[in-house]
Every structure is written in structure tokens, then in C-alpha cells.
Amino acid sequence: MSSDGEFTRTQIFGTVFEITNRYTDLNPVGMGAFGLVCSAVDKLTGQNVAVKKIMKPFSTSVLAKRTYRELKLLKHLKHENLITLDDIFLSPLEDIYFVNELQGTDLHRLLTSRPLEKQFIQYFTYQILRGLKYIHSAGVIHRDLKPSNILINENCDLKICDFGLARIQDPQMTGYVSTRYYRAPEIMLTWQKYDTEVDLWSVGCILAEMIEGKPLFPGKDHVHQFSIITELLGSPPPDVIDTICSENTLRFVQSLPHRDPIPFNERFAQCTHVEPEAIDLLAKMLIFDPKKRISAASALTHPYMEPYHDPTDEPICETKFDWSFNDADLPVDTWRVMMYSEILDFHQIGGVGEEAGQSVTQEEIAHIQQDGIQAPQQPQEQQVE
């Protein structure tokens, strides 16, 4: 470990963590495709926090745009069941760090440790739907809901995280995005046309996994994935087949043997530890035709959610998220300038001054305000000094 002014440099799993001196006691807690997450102690508040390093955010325009999108979403979406952005800073090595409240575990780890009791299944489902109602009202689709993106603390408070794949509600969408087990069939069938209903399919898969303790559709590849979905739901109806854009996909679906659906109360007959209403809600989420799939707002009014449903405490987002940047094809340096601006804006809006442990240094602010921001074309080598 070494210290350089306001920043301390530590190597974790071969990765340099260069964070402000406000955060101490780093310990790795998770690794993803785009970042490493460490727990830390916030010396200012005394709270445990999660510090996420975004790996090489300016190495390509695609990664820069993805990071910018996640930052914009975290700033805009403020809800009890969504992870909130407590701090963000840019290190001297030009890595970006997001700081959030540390949650004790995630649903994936919880499910692999022990079976869930029915009251926890019900409460977790309610909180996921409550968060989704808010996300969808902002004009946002999460696109990557899965147990590892559902964070839970010791009080069973639940927060949805990882908005890096989130996308505008748009009839033309891009291909494979979510972990296969939780991927809606319309993503596999059409690749381009889907909406908020893909998230409800994912919730159905998560609910089934909480009930049975194992993934409902553990496909080995997308062909196998679709095949085992049809084992439960039967062959897709003609109106769904008519939406398939790809000729290859259409030929594949038409080549499958006809299958009749299995009634959900028969498929889950052994799951006597949960209420029949849970299976009924599950059946309303796992429907081939997304237009017939239940919405998050409607799911909150389902009888299974009755013990927790409170229409006065299930807010929507007051303003739609601004997606105007999303179709932009910009060079890395432009995304970098936009990112600097968002970081500075975050600290100004939050009212974070020097007395409160400001993470953006005066040197950074001066750098941000320079005309053109003469940033390096390539990220600097990350070497521990």
C-alpha cells in the first residue's frame, strides 16, 4: 500500500485500487465483468460501504458509454429498493469508483446457503416488484435481473443493483443481454423487440428459484434454454411465432416438436411450503406472450402480495429518464468530458463540500473546467508504486 496526497493505492487480486483516504480497510467482496467490488469503512460516517472500481472505463467508447449510462441511471433513480450512489470519484489513474451502502449478501449467495422460508420468499418478491415498478415508471428496463443483482442486508431489506445493461423502453432493442437462466424468450426469439415485460419474466424465474432452491430453466446454451422453457409452457403460440424476425430462429422454433403446457399447480405440486397464490403469480409472470405477462404495478396488487401491498407507499419516478445520449456514437474523449461533468454535478447537487469529506479535489475541478480537457488518449498503466 502507498499513499499519494488524498489517494491511497492498494493492490487487490492483481488490480490497483486507488481510492481517497476517506475509505479504509478494503476487502474484496465481488468480481464482475466490468468491475471489482470491495468493502470498506467510510471514515467520515463510520459506515461500511461497497466501493466498485470500473475497470478501464475509458479504454473504448463502448465501455465509456456503458459507464456513463450507469452513472446517469444511479443519479436519477432514487428508491428504497434500488442501490443508491453515495459517492463517486475519479482516481489519478483515471479509474472511476462508485461508492454505495454495503449490503450483507445477495440473493444468489442466500439461495446457495439454505432454503428460504415462505415469509422471506414473499417479502423479497414484494420488494423486487416495488423497485421494478419505480424503474419501469422512469422509462427504464433493467434487462439483467438475476439473484446476484439482488442485494439483501441483515434486516432483509432488498436493493436491486447493476444498471450497466439497463436500457430505454424502445421497440428496437439489441440482442443477448442477461444471464441465460433468467432471459425472457422474446429476447431469444426476436433479439430486437422487447419491453419492460422482460424484467417480469426474470422475476418469475427468481421467484421459482426461491421456491425450489434451484434455477427453473438451467439452459446449457440458448437452444437448450428455449427447449426447456417449452417443456413447461408448451410450444409458443402462433402470435408469438409471428413476431420472430430472424429466419434462422423461425426455422429452429418450427423444427421443435409440439409440446403441451404443464399446469403450474401440477408442476409445483410438491412445493407445499408456499401459498397457492405464489404459484398463481408465477404463472402470470412466466407467459410466452409478453403482452399477456403481468406488469410490476399489477403484480403488487396480486393476492400473494396482499400482506405487504400499500398503494400509498409504492412510488413511481416523478420524471422520465433522459435517454437522449444513448444513440450517440462519440469518441472516448467526449465521453470522458461528459463523465467529468456528471461527477462534478453529483457533488454539487449533493452539497458535498470540503467539510463533508469532498472526494472531487480542487485540482480535478480545475481540470474539468479547462477548455477541451486535454485527456490522454490511452489509460495509464496501473502499477503499484
From Swiss-Prot:
Taxonomic placement: Eukaryota, Fungi, Dikarya, Ascomycota, Saccharomycotina
Sequence motif TXY, residues: 174-176
Domain notes: The TXY motif contains the threonine and tyrosine residues whose phosphorylation activates the MAP kinases.
Function: Proline-directed serine/threonine-protein kinase involved in a signal transduction pathway that is activated by changes in the osmolarity of the extracellular environment. Controls osmotic regulation of transcription of target genes.
SMART domains reported in the protein's UniProt record: S_TKc
Major site of localization recorded for this protein: cytoplasm
Keyword terms: Activator, ATP-binding, Cytoplasm, Kinase, Nucleotide-binding, Nucleus, Phosphoprotein, Serine/threonine-protein kinase, Transcription, Transcription regulation, Transferase
Pfam families: Pkinase (PF00069)
Reaction(s) this enzyme catalyzes, per UniProt: L-seryl-[protein] + ATP = O-phospho-L-seryl-[protein] + ADP + H(+); L-threonyl-[protein] + ATP = O-phospho-L-threonyl-[protein] + ADP + H(+)
Residues binding ATP: 29-37, 52
Keyword Transferase attached: yes
Protein name as it appears in the record: Mitogen-activated protein kinase HOG1
Active site per database record: 144
Subcellular localization, as worded in the UniProt entry: Cytoplasm; Nucleus
Family under the similarity heading: Belongs to the protein kinase superfamily. Ser/Thr protein kinase family. MAP kinase subfamily. HOG1 sub-subfamily.
Tagged with keyword Chloroplast: no
The record's account of how the chain is modified after translation: Dually phosphorylated on Thr-174 and Tyr-176, which activates the enzyme.
Name of the gene this protein is made from: HOG1
Gene3D superfamilies: Phosphorylase Kinase, domain 1 (3.30.200.20), Transferase(Phosphotransferase) domain 1 (1.10.510.10)
Record GO biological process: cellular hyperosmotic response; cellular response to oxidative stress; filamentous growth; negative regulation of cytoplasmic translational initiation in response to stress; negative regulation of exit from mitosis; negative regulation of G2/M transition of mitotic cell cycle; negative regulation of induction of conjugation with cellular fusion; osmosensory signaling pathway
Cystine residue pairs: none
